[in-house]
A protein has these predicted regions:
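Metal-dependent nuclease catalytic cores in nucleic-acid-processing enzymes
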Residues: 215-234
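Conserved catalytic cores of phosphodiester-cleaving nucleases, focusing on short active-site segments
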Residues: 189-206
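Active-site metal-binding core of divalent-cation-utilizing nuclease and nuclease-like domains
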Residues: 10-14, 18-24, 57, 166-192
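Residue(s) in the substrate-gating loop at a strand-loop-helix junction
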Residues: 1-154
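Short, conserved active-site entrance elements at the starts or edges of catalytic domains
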Residues: 146-179
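Domain-level recognition of nuclease-like catalytic cores that cleave nucleotide substrates
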Residues: 238-327
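Active-site-adjacent loop/helix micro-motif of nuclease/hydrolase catalytic cores
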Residues: 206-215
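Hydrophobic/aromatic beta-strand patches that form the interior of the parallel beta-sheet core
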Residues: 198, 235-237
Length: 327
């Protein structure tokens, strides 16, 4: 059961014949179309902060990747600067330019993956080859055509799905964070256009707003504790369907059964998160103190007995070992 049901049904884009049989990385495709559609509305952040952080993580272990971010940023800027003028409601660039831009968005998406889940993706990221970081030209060239086809189809749909919004857009920002973002270890939203917070979904499923979607929209809106971004509408755009659904912020919470105003809900969430984080910090402090107490007791027992510490135990207590070396 979903909290909000719009009754809209529109078939999603079909997978093209360029599929080679290998399971596509749908998450990467979703991230790349997100980044591409952000560039439709604002070019203030050519490479999203999450991708920049992923590059920083990659460079720490592979310093030869240092130039990748600068070259990626410069390539996006150059491509957009050279694009021919288009009507205000036009999303898609000429085919060759569009495909080139999509390749760059995929590379940015691969960097984003390193930020989101470094340990899980570092062994399979295309940004490494034989244990070394690939060059920017290699990263761009190796993006599969199947991925480009999938993304290009979604950009074509956006001509009608987002064209009107783009034509009348005034102030747009992407990858925004909120005053409450740090309270949940970071949260950044896709796009804010003239007070409309819009989240992109690249799911194949029907365009029904699921419970998790509702929680996400509500959470982002309420994390703007101080109304810094002046959000007055929230919505979802389904990239594979070309459908957008929006709600006024008060109306959205009324649909969810809220009996308090948005400012009251924000104040309540701020108090709840502060209490939760305080409790979590106390638990961390207690665990750290207990661990330090155990390490001290172990070290004293070892000195008194004069026995060697088993190798297995040393591996289990790296913090204790580092202190021994310091002494």
């Amino acid at each position: 059961m979903t909290a909000v049901h719009d009754g809209v049904r529109k078939q999603a884009l079909r997978t093209k014949s360029s599929h080679t049989g290998k399971r596509p990385d749908w998450g990467l495709i979703g991230t790349a179309i997100d980044f591409r559609l952000r560039l439709v509305f604002t070019t203030d952040d050519l490479v999203p902060v999450s991708a920049r952080r992923g590059h920083a993580a990659l460079t720490r272990n592979h310093p030869e990747a240092a130039a990748l971010l600068g070259e990626l940023t410069a390539a996006i800027a150059s491509l957009l600067a050279e694009a021919p003028p288009q009507s205000a409601d036009r999303i898609e660039l000429p085919e060759s330019s569009e495909n080139d831009l999509l390749r760059l968005c995929v590379v940015a998406g691969q960097l984003d993956q390193l930020y989101r889940s470094y340990l899980h993706v570092i062994d399979k990221t295309p940004l490494l080859d034989g244990g070394r970081a690939v060059t920017f030209d290699q990263a761009r060239a190796q993006v599969p055509w199947f991925v480009i086809d999938q993304l290009h189809d979604q950009v074509c749909l956006a001509n009608t799905g987002l064209g009107e919004l783009r034509a009348r857009a005034g102030i747009a920002r992407s990858g925004i964070s909120f005053s409450g973002s740090d309270s949940i270890d970071g949260a950044d939203a896709d796009l804010l256009v003239d007070g409309l917070f819009l989240d992109f979904k690249s799911t194949h499923a029907a365009t029904t707003i699921t419970k998790s979607d509702v929680y996400q929209l509500a959470g982002y809106a309420l994390l703007d504790f101080d109304d810094e971004h002046h959000i007055d509408h929230v919505g979802i755009y389904w990239t594979r369907h070309g459908i957008k659904r929006t709600f006024s912020l008060p109306g959205f919470f009324e649909l969810l059964g809220a009996t308090e105003t948005v400012p009251e809900l924000r104040a309540g969430l701020r108090v709840e998160l502060a209490a939760y984080n305080e409790q979590r910090q106390r638990a961390r402090d207690a665990a750290r103190n207990a661990a330090e107490h155990r390490e001290t007791a172990d070290a004293e027992a070892s000195r008194e007995s004069g026995e060697e510490i088993p190798v297995r135990r040393i591996h289990q207590t790296p913090r204790w070992l580092s202190r021994v070396f310091q002494r």
